[in-house]
Structures are given as structure tokens and as C-alpha cells.
Amino acid sequence: MFSCCFPTSRGCCFRNGGSESLFRQCRRRLIPHPRRLWPFVRRRTQVPQDSPGQALAGQATPEIPSGLPLHIVLVQEEIREPMEAQTHAPGPYADIAALAAPAVEPKPAWEEPPPERALEVEGAPAKDQPSQELPEIMAPTVATGLNAGAENVAGERSGREGVTSTAPASRSHAAPSPGHGGKHGGGDQGIQTGLLYLAGERLLSFAGTTALLLQGLFIVLILVGYISVKVMLKSIKTRLGRRVPAAPPALRRNLLLQAWKCVCNWASRLFAPNVLPRTGS
């Protein structure tokens, strides 16, 4: 008897235990050629020559690699050699023989069942395998000196108290928990921060626009003032020109000569020596 590992793509895959013919077919395929399981098995060659298990030295033993979903299944091998030597003394594999054959067999990865058999296998586990129901958990009984009737009344009261106690619990579930409230509060705080940022941005843009408008208005006022002053000066000049008649060009030259002569006389008088007045003897 040796153990064999059947790796499958979907992990451990079981079939109905009633298909004995398929089980024998798989056993005949695997036992004569143990080298097919080379990545997953190894041979035990260190077997004493005088031990009764020498006939099983060429069998393969499983070696489960890490990271592969495997299921170990015990397969019984038919040994054609006479077993007289093994009947006298139990060998090292006697404890394995005591184990019962598995009730279910693995589904080989290289063989697909026919559609009819697949339908039977899909419907079989619900009928063949008994459903294991969990034992009903009972409350610990306390030894009291009351009779059976008093104990029944006490049990009914405790049941009513349990029903009434579940109502506040359901109401508490309906109320928002502090964790959810904190999440909603954080969301409201984020929304408020975004609104404040948007309001500040709009306020800055409004202030910049107002500054530009004031600057343009100031420039317009300066231009209007300059134009108005220029118009006023021009009107004053026109009024003064109407009152004083303009002299002809010849008279202007004479006026200039007379003004020059006056300036020269004033300068000669200014720089002339002081003449002392004569005094009588």
C-alpha cells in the first residue's frame, strides 16, 4: 500500500464513492507506472534486505511540494507475489493496512467523466452523504430546589426578558453609530472647506476687478480735468485779447526801442560815481 497525491486545478476535487470500476481503472493506471508522479513522489530505496517489507521497496512515497493544493489518498496495491513471508511477522506497513479505504475517490485531472456520470455525481452527494447537523446549544442548567413547574415558569420569564432585551438592541442598530457620524462629519467638514475656498477665490477676483475699474476711472477723471483746464485757459486768453487792441508791427518795433533805451539809462545811472553836492564858503 502506498499513498499518492492527485494535484488538481481547482484544489481537492471529490467524486462519489460508488464508482468502483473507475477506482480500479485509476489504480491500474497509476500502480504499474509510479514514475508518472515524478514531481510529487520519491522512492524509498533504503529498505533492509531481511525486512518483510522488501517487496514494497520499489513503491513510491508521496512528497508534497509547497504551494500546490493536494489531497493524499491511500490506494491499495495488489501484490501478485506470495505473501507467506509477511504473514509470520507484521512489517513496517502494517499500521497503514489497518486504515480503512477512503469513502470517496479523487477526480483525476487527466480524465473527464461522461455527461451522464457527471449528472449522477452532482446529484449524489446530497443523497449519499448525510448532513451533519450541529448539536443544539442548550443553556447551562442550574441545580435548584424548585419543582418542574417552577422551573418552567422561570424559563418562560427568562424568554420574555430576552425578547424585550432584543428590542432596544435593534433600535440601537437603527441609530447611527459614532463611527458613521464621524465619517459624515468629516465629509461635511470637507464640503465646508471647499465652499470657503470657493468664496475666498471669488472675493479675490472681485477685489481685483474693482481695483482695475477704479484705476480706469481715475485715468478718465485726470483726462477730463486736463481738457477742462485747457479749455478754460483758452477762453481767458480770448477775453483778454478782445479788450486790448493789438498794435501794428511798426509800433511794436518803436516800443521795443523805447524799452531798450529806458533799460540802458537806468543801468548808466546805477553804475555812475556819486557826485557830492557843493557847499558854500
From Swiss-Prot:
The keyword Transmembrane helix applies. It is found in: Membrane. The chain crosses the membrane at residues 207-227. Disulfide bonds: none annotated. It is a single-pass membrane protein. One of its GO terms (cellular component) is membrane. Residues 108-120 have a biased composition (Basic and acidic residues). Residues 165-178 have a biased composition (Low complexity). Residues 107-131, 150-187 are annotated as: Disordered. Keywords: Membrane, Transmembrane, Transmembrane helix. Signal peptide: none annotated. Its main location: membrane. PANTHER family: CMT1A DUPLICATED REGION TRANSCRIPT 15 PROTEIN-LIKE PROTEIN. This is CMT1A duplicated region transcript 15 protein-like protein. It comes from Homo sapiens. The lineage of its organism: Eukaryota, Metazoa, Chordata, Craniata, Vertebrata.
